[in-house]
């Protein structure tokens, strides 16, 4: 979550600006996407927001107080990720190209940007529809999902990435659909310093509270918000997805991100 000294817009500016100017220069990084929680509440601020409430269930009342945004870091190998925070040889100096020590610190603004230290998790990514980005901002929605224990992990995954995703992939105006399933693989040890707040008792409790509400993030990119509301609430699609979600999900709710 953002530092209490920052407004949400100031957090966005600080993360997108200064912090990401170093994060995108981490050694061997292949991709970096920052998602900041939108100022618009998808369940309240649109003409058809009431529809979102109809397909959402078991969202914690304080969920938005637990996150301000999340970055997605892509590396070829785990070893590249764990050694990424090193000085980068990409700064012009009086004697030619120099190492920039601030890249190793990712700008050194953690205590001013965040409330406590951030935490990170590994995901298994399944690309259902590759993201096609036109030259303008897309309408991006995250569906936070928690699986119930009705099905085995293998069977649930086959249903989620099979019939459920296939139905969603046919929505008009859809520019991308990606499923991210959180794993238990440790990507924090040796990336953050041992004394970081995220390893303290308070930090662990904060992280576990956030995790208990979801284990899957489904990312939707739409050409605009009108396509989301018209396509996602198509009667035939809605009938199918509602049956699936009521049977196999413990919780499901939606958030717009920039």
Per-region residue spans from a language model:
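Macromolecular interaction modules
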Residues: 1-258
């Amino acid at each position: 979550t953002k530092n209490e000294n920052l407004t949400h817009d100031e957090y966005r500016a600080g993360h997108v600006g200064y912090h990401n100017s170093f994060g995108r220069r981490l050694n061997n990084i292949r991709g970096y996407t920052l998602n900041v929680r939108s100022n618009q509440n998808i369940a309240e601020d649109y003409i058809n927001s009431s529809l979102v409430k109809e397909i959402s269930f078991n969202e914690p009342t304080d969920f938005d107080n637990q996150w301000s945004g999340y970055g997605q870091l892509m590396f070829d190998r785990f070893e590249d990720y764990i050694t990424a925070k090193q000085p980068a040889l990409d700064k012009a100096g009086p004697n030619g190209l120099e190492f920039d020590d601030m890249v190793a610190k990712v700008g050194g603004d953690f205590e001013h940007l965040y409330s406590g230290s951030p935490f990170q998790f590994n995901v298994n990514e399944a690309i259902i529809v590759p993201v096609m980005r036109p030259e303008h901002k897309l309408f991006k929605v995250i569906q936070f999902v928690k699986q119930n224990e009705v099905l085995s992990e293998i069977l649930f995954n086959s249903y989620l990435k099979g019939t459920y995703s296939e139905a969603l992939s046919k929505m008009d105006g859809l520019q991308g659909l990606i499923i991210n399933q959180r794993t238990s693989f440790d990507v924090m040890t040796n990336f953050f310093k041992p004394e970081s707040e995220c390893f303290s008792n308070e930090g662990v409790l904060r992280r576990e509270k956030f995790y208990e509400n979801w284990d899957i993030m489904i990312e939707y990119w739409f050409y605009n918000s009108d396509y989301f509301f018209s396509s996602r609430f198509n009667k035939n699609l809605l009938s199918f997805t509602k049956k699936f979600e009521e049977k196999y999900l413990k919780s499901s709710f939606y958030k717009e991100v920039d």
